[in-house]
UniProtKB/Swiss-Prot annotation:
Any one biological process term the GO annotation gives: riboflavin biosynthetic process
Record has Coiled coil as a keyword: no
Protein name: 6,7-dimethyl-8-ribityllumazine synthase
Entry superkingdom: Bacteria
Binding site for (2S)-2-hydroxy-3-oxobutyl phosphate: 87-88, 129
Keyword Transferase tagged: yes
Active site: 90 (proton donor)
Species, as recorded: Chlorobium phaeovibrioides (strain DSM 265 / 1930)
Family annotation (InterPro entries): LS, LS/RS, LS/RS_sf
Length: 155
């Protein structure tokens, strides 16, 4: 008997994808949105199947992503934002809670929720990951969502 291998592909032709974006550090968030939309387009997706939801900050991303996922309108959700370390422990709390909350929302809803939230030590690292030296993590998160949509469809 041959082992069956199931994988998701990268076609986004009929994929309905919601982007949930933190407005805090918006100049980074907007670059991540541009990267995500570019990825969806390059993989055959269309703008009419993309919706963008904006929330105040990274702490709110999990609850908005969960609510969006529960609408049943989308095949996947992509969370985008930037949490940049400051001089207080606030970074650690927000980064941990956003990460945990997004994972929990995906598990509870059964809808793939991709993590495209930057957690960086400084603004330079965030800029690098939003479309310069280190690529665009919004693009990467959208690609993860597309692959997960196709994997779910193959199950």
């Amino acid at each position: 008997m041959q082992i069956q291998q199931i994988e998701g592909g990268f076609g986004a032709q009929d994929a309905r994808i919601a982007l949930v974006v933190s407005r805090f550090n918006d100049f980074i968030g907007q670059k991540l949105v541009e990267g995500a939309i570019d990825c969806i387009r390059r993989n055959g997706g269309s703008e009419e199947n993309i919706a963008i939801y904006r929330c105040p900050g990274a702490f709110e991303l999990p609850m908005v992503a969960k609510k969006v996922a529960l609408t049943g309108k989308y095949d996947a959700v992509v969370t985008l934002g930037a949490i940049i370390r400051g001089s207080t422990p606030h970074f650690d709390v927000i980064a941990a809670e956003a990460t945990k909350g997004i994972a929990q929302a995906s598990l509870e809803t059964g809808v793939p929720i991709a993590f495209g939230v930057l957690t960086t030590e400084n603004i330079e690292q965030a800029i690098e990951r939003a479309g310069t030296k280190a690529g665009n993590k919004g693009f990467d998160a959208a690609l993860t969502a597309i692959e997960m949509i196709n994997l779910y469809r193959a199950m």
